[in-house]
């Protein structure tokens, strides 16, 4: 897909609010990403998150860390404010990704634990972190950059526009858990 077709596809498949939000996050995000490389990080502090909520492997690792690893401070980061309120009622240390506390914890935590991409937590604060992708299932089909049909075949294309608009797709984790070396 050439760049002009990609731009047309973006405008036809997103509402204008999403496009404006994406542009604002890009203009503010890139300077924040550069700043995040300069801030010291604590190896005791781990931020965890998943774009679909407090679920899957990340949830269970959070619960394990909270219960058994007293040298680790697990912090749940979410983009859903109502989810944060529910988690806090259950005693879970949870923050909104763009709140001052959320940004502070993201900028000062060394470990980022997520299920899909760094954007599950906050890509823009991840400079200098150790990224761990727990993934959310066992692959039985082609995904992401291996796809040739559907919406992913348009997003997961290595071109300059995608690298600028979706930089989190191109950041490889430092550790990726898998069921075998063949995955």
What are these regions (language model features)?
Residues 45-183:
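Active-site and donor-binding regions of nucleotide-sugar-utilizing enzymes
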Residues 1-50, 157:
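Membrane-proximal basic amphipathic "stem/tether" segments
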């Amino acid at each position: 897909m050439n760049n002009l077709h990609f731009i047309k596809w973006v405008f036809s498949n997103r509402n204008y609010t999403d496009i404006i939000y994406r542009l604002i996050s890009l203009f503010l995000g890139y300077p924040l990403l550069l700043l995040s490389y300069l801030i010291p990080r604590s190896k005791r502090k781990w931020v965890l998150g998943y774009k679909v909520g407090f679920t899957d492997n990340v949830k269970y690792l959070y619960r394990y860390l909270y219960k058994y690893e007293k040298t680790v401070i697990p912090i749940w980061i979410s983009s859903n404010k109502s989810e944060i309120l529910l988690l806090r009622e259950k005693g879970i240390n949870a923050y909104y990704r763009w709140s001052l506390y959320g940004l502070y914890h993201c900028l000062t935590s060394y470990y980022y634990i997520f299920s899909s991409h760094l954007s599950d937590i906050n890509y823009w604060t991840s400079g200098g972190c150790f990224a761990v992708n727990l993934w959310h299932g066992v692959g039985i089909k082609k995904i992401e950059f291996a796809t040739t049909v559907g919406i992913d075949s348009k997003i997961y294309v290595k071109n300059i526009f995608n690298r600028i608009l979706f930089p989190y797709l191109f950041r490889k984790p430092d550790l990726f858990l898998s069921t075998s070396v063949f995955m």
